[in-house]
Amino acid sequence: MPKVYVSSVIDAPAERVWREVRDFNALPRWLPAVADSRIEGDAPPDQIGCVRAFTLKAGGALREKLLALSDFDYSVCYAILESPMPVSNYVATLRLAPVTDGERCFAEWTAEFDCEPSRAEELVERIGRGVFQPGFDELKRRVGRR
């Protein structure tokens, strides 16, 4: 099972960054590849089990289900239900932790999924460098100290 791991330090308190990522429907604000997003069935965006449907600026649509959300741990876990990527059993977690020597936080985003073995390396790279890292870069731009 391939694993993606990307981490970063953001020059903002974890609480401030969490306000951006906590909203399961807020991807267009901080994930550059996302054009628009909506929560199906008008469910609250923090309701476990809610499904977000979103489109990518480059084309393609995804549906993801919220599996866990913790204001205590600053973490969100979700699964891909439908995607143009050739993956299955995809589960990802984005987690924030305060850095104790200043108003910064450590952010990590992980994912595990199944795919054809010949595609694993390419997909890990594509997700890590093409999705997760640009998301962290945009969060730094939006909420980091200037």
Model-predicted regions and their roles:
Residues 10, 57, 100-102:
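A generic beta-sheet turn/junction motif
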Residues 8, 24-25, 107, 144-146:
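Plant-biased detector of terminal regions, especially N-terminal secretory signal peptides
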Residues 81-134:
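Beta-strand/loop substructures that line and gate deep hydrophobic ligand-binding cavities in soluble
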Residues 1-44:
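Hydrophobic ligand-binding cavity/cleft-lining segments
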Residues 14-15, 68-73, 96-106:
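A short, structured loop/turn motif at beta-sheet edges
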Residues 2, 58-60, 88, 103:
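Short acidic/polar mixed-charge low-complexity motifs
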Residues 6-8, 62-68, 91-98:
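Hydrophobic/aromatic beta-strand elements that line small-molecule binding cavities or substrate pockets
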Residues 29, 38-86, 134, 138-146:
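Glycine-rich portal/gate segments that line the openings of hydrophobic small-molecule binding cavities
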